[in-house]
Amino acid sequence: EDNYLFKDFNLEIEESSFVSIIGMNGSGKSTLAKILIGLYKAEGYITIDGYLLNEQFIKKIRRIFSVCFANSETHFIGETVRDDLVFSLENLGYFYDEMTTLIDIISKKFKLENILDKEPSLLTESEKTKVAIASSLIHSPKILLLDETINKLTDTDKKLVFKLLKEYQKEKKLTIILITHNLEETLFSDRIIVLENGKIIKDETKEEIYKNDYLERKGFELPFVVKLSQNLILYDLLDKVYFSENEVMNKLWP
């Protein structure tokens, strides 16, 4: 029992929320991800959209719960990007006409049209990551888990991906679980959970957690716009923390 990383661990994530899970190395972030997808067994129980995570419901869970890991190479098994998108859908029982339509839609959203017939090995790291995320979303799952996935994207692709994730959250009620060590990525989430040695030491809205220097005292590097906002609050130039530079500029020079 003393070897358990997680003890008396309870976590509930609301439907269509965007939750960031952060923590230093060894905090349990990636272990939690592996537990959530059934790679590690856990005592107690895990339910996903009302289904117990076990052999009986694993097929149903795979349809509603998509996962994208840091190593995008694990998503590629076909000779082309198109092959891999087809494989994602074939696995879930889609017919040819449905697959063609869904691939067309997702490739336009993620700007993949020019690389659909490329070999995955010829893609940049950012392109590979973008394809992996697109592949995870192509069948419109209810839940998407991103485990240290975003950091390989270029700044341009990050903006596109986060824009699309927010659209999926709003329009398709997608629940997003983002595991990251980069606090810049948490600016798009609604709720931030801090892990330390397998325990939740903080669980607050983005607005609450960035009100003070708690995360900085814990050794995290705050996002630039948060640090800027906090400094401007000290001089009574802002009334609260803002999460985009445009918002800060508009408040300072309306």
Where do the PLM segments sit?
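The feature captures the beta-strand-to-loop junction immediately N-terminal to the Walker
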Residues: 22-24
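Conserved ABC ATPase signature
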Residues: 119-123, 127
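Conserved ABC transporter NBD signature motif
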Residues: 44-53, 61-62
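Helix-to-loop junction immediately C-terminal to a conserved catalytic motif
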Residues: 37
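Catalytic Walker B motif of ABC-type/P-loop ATPase nucleotide-binding domains
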Residues: 144-148
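Conserved ABC ATPase "signature" C-loop
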Residues: 197-198
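Conserved ABC ATPase "signature" region
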Residues: 97-115
